[in-house]
Amino acid sequence: MSLVQSTAAMSFFRLSNLRCKSILGCGAFFILAALASPAATLPTGFTETEFGGSLSGAPTAMEFSPDGRLFICLQTGQVRIIKNGSLLATPFLSLSVDSSGERGLLGVAFDPNFFTNHYVYVYYTVPTFPIHNRVSRFTAAGDVTAPGSEVVILNLDNLSSATNHNGGALHFGPDGKLYIGVGENANGANAQTLSNLLGKVLRINSNGSIPTDNPFYNSATGNNRAIWALGLRNPFTFAFQPGMTRMFINDVGESTYEEINDGIAGSNYGWPVTEGPTNNPSFRSPIYFYQHDIGCAIVGGAFYNPPVLQFPSSYLGKYFFADLCAGWIHVFNPASGMTTDFASGINTPVDLHVGPDGALYYLDRGSGGQVFRVSALPAQALNISGRAAVETGQGVAISGFIVTGTVPKRVGVRAIGPSLANFGIADALMDPVLQLNRADGSLVMANDNWKNTQQAQLMAAGLAPANDNEAALIATLPAGNYSAIVSGKNGGTGVALAEVYDLDPTSNSRLANVSTRAHVGTDSDVLISGFITGNRIGATRVAIRALGPSLQKFGIANPLPDPQLALVNANGTLLASDDDWQTHQAQAAAITSYGLAPSNNLESAIAISLAPGSYTAIVTGKNNQTGVALIEVYDEQ
């Protein structure tokens, strides 16, 4: 990091009037060299991608909305949205703010009832005299703010001429209350008094009223009854552990320590009397701290407890945090109190969150502002299959798949029919015919009776079908979309199994996103898609969809009216199920974040992370309905 970048970054969190007469003279936080952000150094098995493009501004915070969009605060007063991986051109919100020093738009949060009331809360510095920080509520109207919807929730104390130590983090806790981190405005004495809100964590109701069970409700007066914890210098970031009541507060120190504090009601964390660990019984020591030889300003803070597991399970319950100046991300284990290195070489991280897809997102203030997504390399999909009732016309079975990567992929494709009778399938297709087509419908290869063409190759690959009337082929395919079409010879009908095998799993290309379209009947004639995951680092993160009603707009005359979806493992144990994809909010948010939201509410979807093994997705009709359905299995990285 250059000297210009380093001092610029440090001033936003650390410099006080005692250490620097003029913050701008020391290099204000928003003045950063426009250098390209280098790729972070990550552990083996992880990868990083830019998410959404340049923000063209100085970001301060970000938060995922309950529906999966990413909202990003710019210090100058704009809230930008990244939706389905793209930065929207129109800001969600544009405010007039005082953005001098560390002031500006500093935090955003979403009401627990966002799907109903569409309330969005922000923390910003009012630009008119007397200058102060404020929490306001706005109503979302899609991807923009409803005009005239601002409701002031809380006005904080008037600020001195010092423009640093504003805090700005705000999050709703598991109790439905709004928690707010407030800096001490470069005056340590503020942190030790109940006569103002500075240097504190506050707790209020969503409408701005103060809960009567706050720890200082009966000892403070007026708005100061909102104080929940005190003795903090600049709690710029904090986080709640999803599904738990635990809260970690990151406090930026002055000359010695950066702190992670256990957020406990009524606690006094000691600033300015003490910094870092203390034996004073009046103060609560941090649960983790580090000295300034490895960093200068703690930021971020996110527990790894996502609705969809994308990282290896060993990360569950761990706490990710970053340092603004040192440009690293570390992982804290609350159980052991130990930390491990995770990422280094980041330009200027200011915030990080775990997304609804289970990936880790960090906000980099360098190069005009960027978001980066860190994900575990998923396990390899080794083979995929679809079992369905094969009819004529639109009722043939179609299994689609995608080859990704930079080198061609060698695959084996089979159409199994007669040998299914050995597994109790009474109406098996007696003579399947197999076609492999490109996305434009052109033929790659075809086969009827596997011994006719590639017998030696199929036997060498271990793919020789059990019955001579079954079809199989081997092809080497460049990246692209492909369809394996199974029909009955001479118009024959019955249940068949289409299989696609990865015959070169160690190459840089992969099989992904399998789909099968066929008629869904009852009993053994339901639609089944099986897949096997191999053993790379990390779980395989998949999204599975069962589509029916929306097929009508593609010319399917008899789509399945209401598909139901179930996922089982090799032992037949049910792992997940869905009927109507919007029923489960967390899962719906993950599906939406992948850009895979079905167009009809009656269609089903599952987002899940899977360990190496064999899995089966099953589509049935609700109340024994029948019709054509499409099952899709997406490999999400």
Label each residue range with its predicted role.
Residues 40-55, 150, 285-287:
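A short helix->beta-strand "capping" segment at the edge of beta-propeller domains
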Residues 41, 57, 103-105, 113-115, ...:
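Beta-propeller domain segments
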Residues 50-55, 92-100, 154-161, 227-231, ...:
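Surface loop/turn motifs at the tips and blade-to-blade linkers of beta-strand repeat domains
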Residues 52-77, 299:
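Beta-strand-rich domains and repeat architectures in extracellular enzymes and scaffolds
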Residues 132-171:
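Asp-box/WD-like beta-propeller blade repeats and closely related beta-sheet repeat scaffolds
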Residues 338-356:
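Conserved blade-ending motifs and adjacent loop-strand segments that build the rim/top face
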Residues 378-637:
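A sequence-level detector for low-complexity, Ser/Thr- and acidic-rich stretches
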